[in-house]
């Protein structure tokens, strides 16, 4: 997999601090704090840890309190940034170049076609961007904030919507974030339990697992060819969500992947050998003690 995504345009932005905000309808959002500093980084350089962190946030949702879940999701966002749901959900991250936003089936928005301004309002609930749209024509002004202007200049070759995801007034709904982490952990659990208990399942149960796995998917990253020391494929990720989802998918399908589920604490971890079933000696000892009862 390293070779497959050796060349990737995957720079992302996280802020030094995020905060909770509630809109007029009582929905909670995570958004950069007013004085937070944007930090540009490459999430694919540490993709294994990022996927592991995402899975464990999702896995802990099943058993943890609301407070701990909120803390875990905020911790992930602080470490890696918001997921870029605005560019991940539509059929194309360049949706601003079209008359409307076209959306495949998803958990969050039922409409298949949506007015661009209405769609943007889902991600800018507090401070609207200075954005004008008329048919395919659009105009976006960034005024006053030199840091935001610098970010826009840095990512000027990317779709406008992706750059908007990096703005200080961009926000993502907490319940949408929570559902995304749930989906990832459900897929991971399904893949683990299917092969762990396959011999004990009837065919109807197997089909339920298969259907659940088949529903996992999303938009594929775009790519282009470049002539370097030799022709290379350059993959382009326009959202952190897509980067995580693609890396996770390849881990699941990779026969040599060391990604496992601890039989004791039910956390995801990477094994050092095929015989390992526990993330730590403490978990192994606790599991053995439990089985003695």
Where do the PLM segments sit?
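Short helix-coil boundary/hinge micro-motifs
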Residues: 1-269
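Short, charged low-complexity intrinsically disordered segments located at boundaries
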Residues: 219, 223, 276-279, 292
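Cysteine-rich micro-motifs
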Residues: 273-286
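Contiguous alpha-helical segments
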Residues: 287-293
């Amino acid at each position: 997999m390293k070779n497959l995504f050796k060349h990737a345009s995957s720079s992302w932005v996280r802020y030094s601090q995020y905060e909770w905000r509630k809109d007029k309808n009582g929905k909670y959002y995570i958004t950069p704090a007013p004085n937070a500093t944007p930090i540009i980084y490459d999430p694919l350089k540490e993709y294994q840890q990022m996927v592991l962190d995402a899975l464990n946030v999702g896995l802990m949702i099943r058993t943890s309190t609301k407070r701990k879940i909120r803390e875990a999701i905020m911790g992930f966002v602080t470490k890696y940034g918001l997921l870029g749901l605005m560019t991940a959900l539509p059929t194309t991250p360049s949706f601003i170049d079209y008359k409307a936003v076209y959306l495949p089936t998803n958990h969050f928005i039922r409409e298949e076609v949506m007015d661009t301004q209405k769609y943007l309002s889902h991600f800018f609930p507090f401070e609207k961007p200075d954005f004008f749209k008329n048919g395919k024509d659009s105009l976006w002004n960034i005024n006053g904030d030199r840091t935001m202007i610098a970010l826009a200049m840095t990512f000027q070759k990317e779709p406008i919507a992706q750059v908007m995801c990096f703005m200080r007034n961009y926000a993502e709904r907490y319940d949408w974030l929570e559902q995304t982490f749930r989906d990832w952990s459900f897929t991971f659990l399904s893949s683990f339990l299917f092969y762990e208990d396959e011999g004990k399942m009837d065919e109807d149960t197997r089909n339920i697992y298969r259907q659940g796995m088949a529903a996992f998917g999303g938009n594929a990253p775009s790519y282009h060819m470049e002539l370097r020391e030799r022709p290379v494929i350059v993959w382009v990720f326009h959202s952190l969500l897509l980067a995580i989802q693609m890396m996770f998918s390849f881990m699941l399908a990779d026969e040599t992947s060391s990604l496992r589920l601890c039989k004791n604490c039910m956390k995801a971890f990477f094994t050092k050998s095929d015989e390992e079933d526990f993330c730590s000696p403490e978990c192994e000892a606790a599991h053995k003690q439990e089985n003695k009862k």
